[in-house]
From Swiss-Prot:
The gene coding this protein: nsfl1c
Protein name: NSFL1 cofactor p47 homolog
Lineage: Eukaryota, Amoebozoa, Evosea, Eumycetozoa, Dictyostelia
Subcellular location: Nucleus; Golgi apparatus, Golgi stack; Cytoplasm, Cytoskeleton, Microtubule organizing center, Centrosome
UniProt biased composition (Low complexity): 298-334
Organism of origin: Dictyostelium discoideum (Social amoeba)
Pfam families assigned to the protein according to its UniProt record, in alphabetical order: SEP, UBA_4, UBX
Molecular function via GO: lipid binding; ubiquitin binding
Domain UBX: 337-413
InterPro entries assigned to the protein according to its UniProt record, in alphabetical order: C6orf106_UBA-like, NSFL1C_SEP_dom_sf, SEP_domain, UBA-like_sf, Ubiquitin-like_domsf, UBX_dom
Domain SEP: 213-279
Summary of the function given for this chain in its UniProt record: Reduces the ATPase activity of VCP. Necessary for the fragmentation of Golgi stacks during mitosis and for VCP-mediated reassembly of Golgi stacks after mitosis. May play a role in VCP-mediated formation of transitional endoplasmic reticulum (tER). Reduces the ATPase activity of VCP. Necessary for the fragmentation of Golgi stacks during mitosis and for VCP-mediated reassembly of Golgi stacks after mitosis. May play a role in VCP-mediated formation of transitional endoplasmic reticulum (tER). Regulates the centrosomal levels of kinase aurK/Aurora during mitotic progression by promoting aurK removal from centrosomes in prophase. Also, regulates spindle orientation during mitosis.
Length: 415
């Protein structure tokens, strides 16, 4: 023992243990000072942790009671039992959280915990909240109405559907902005008496149809629910049970999955309006077409169609800002019916359209005089042919036949 007195003294100075304890640990480790000190420190830390725990399993307490009734060991060598692994019952994390992974249910339970510590529970019930749930390519958006308390009827059914959807992982979500489609999606030409002449209207950039997400809206009413603008469907109808059960489980119903026509999947919005009665939207009334029409082209028409053309001009709308609702009072042209005739259509600068009959021998000056008389203006102008537009450069004394303007369309362009 005298040979190990220095090791015992060193162990006591390091650990603060008694001489008997120091001797026991050193002998247990073949007088290896480092290993003995490490074992002593580890056991002391575990012992302190056990003392700090408020609850210990009953089987461990029973062992301690049994140890009290056992005969003590000889005082010459104290016995230090191996520490029992501490077993403390802990409350399982809500939502099945495993290995530090937070699931959708964990977020949902966190919401409930926050509400338990808040003073405004009644205010929370009066707010309209929006939730979403679902997978990578599809999901549900749940927009709940203010709760009015369960009083039976459809309110209980709808509340059960929404509460169940939230329990299956619904979390708060912002409302999506629905992009409105462009009203024009083609290529065209703007025709008319404009300073730019004919103008090409380019086609806007096309949107990739595969990048769009198909959206379906399910609205819950007092009497039942509707899908988009479809008819009212009753809650107690057995045909609707599968759809409601899928929503309660937090998944997109199979019936709605058929609407997913793009790779980006389906977005289903649930709106809780069970406090409101469903009102069927008014059906649009059918209105028969009552406007006028015009045959395009330069085909020859007889003089008997002049009255019909004038009536059509009264009902025809144009794109210019100076549209007129009726044809001006035109001056008559002396037409020799025994001579060849032609019909010339004239589009005035103010948007009005004229259609009159000339002889082949009438000159361009006759046409100019007719336009001035019809428009009531002597402002100088140029005459352009139809499409493609180009100015008429012939002398005013040239006949319509020689100028190649038989059955032509002329456009007035002010200078």
């Amino acid at each position: 023992m005298s040979d190990h007195s220095e090791a015992i003294a060193t162990f006591q100075s390091i650990t603060g243990a008694s001489k008997e304890e120091s001797t026991f640990y050193l002998e247990s480790h073949d007088w290896d000072l480092e290993k003995a000190a490490q074992t002593f420190t580890t056991l002391q830390e575990e012992e302190n942790q056990r003392n700090d725990q408020p609850q210990i399993e009953e089987d461990y307490e029973d062992e301690e009671e049994e140890d009290d009734h056992r005969d003590p060991m000889p005082a010459s060598r104290p016995v230090y039992s191996k520490p029992v692994a501490k077993t403390v019952s802990k409350k399982a994390p809500a939502g099945g959280r495993v290995g530090g992974i937070r699931t959708l249910s964990d977020f949902n339970n966190d919401d409930h915990d926050d509400h338990d510590h808040s003073d405004g529970d009644d205010d929370e019930d009066d707010r309209s909240q929006q939730y979403f749930t679902g997978g990578e390519k599809s999901g549900l958006v749940v927009e709940s109405a203010p709760k009015k308390g369960k009083n039976g009827g459809s309110g209980d059914i709808v509340n059960d559907v929404f509460d169940s959807a939230k329990r299956h992982g619904a979390v708060a979500s912002n409302e999506k902005k629905v992009e409105k489609p462009d009203s024009f999606d083609s290529v065209g030409y703007q025709l008319g008496a404009t300073d730019q002449g004919n103008r090409n209207v380019s086609k806007p950039k096309e949107k990739d149809p595969n990048s769009q997400v198909v959206e379906v809206k399910v609205t819950f009413w007092n009497q039942g629910f509707t899908i988009d603008d479809g008819p009212l469907r009753k809650y107690d109808n057995p045909e609707n049970k599968e759809l409601l059960d899928d929503i309660q489980r937090g998944i997109v119903p199979r019936e709605l999955q058929k609407k997913a026509t793009t790779p980006n999947g389906l977005s289903v919005t649930l709106i809780n309006n069970h406090n409101q009665d469903y009102v069927e939207p008014a059906k649009p009334k059918y209105v028969a077409f009552s406007g006028g029409g015009q045959t395009l082209g330069s085909s020859s028409t007889s003089t008997n169609n002049n009255n019909n053309n004038n009536n059509n001009n009264n009902n025809r709308a144009t794109t210019t800002s100076t549209t007129t609702t009726s044809t001006p009072n035109v001056s008559s042209i002396n037409v020799d019916q025994s001579q060849p005739t032609t019909t010339v259509q004239i589009r005035l600068a103010n948007g009005s359209r004229l259609s009159t009959t000339f002889n082949h021998s009438h000159t361009l000056q006759d046409v100019i005089n007719y336009i001035n008389s019809s428009s009531g203006s002597n402002q100088s102008f140029d005459l352009l042919t139809g499409f493609p537009q180009k100015p008429v450069t012939n002398p005013t004394s040239t006949t319509l036949k020689d100028a190649g303007l038989l059955n032509a369309l002329l456009i007035q362009k002010l200078k």
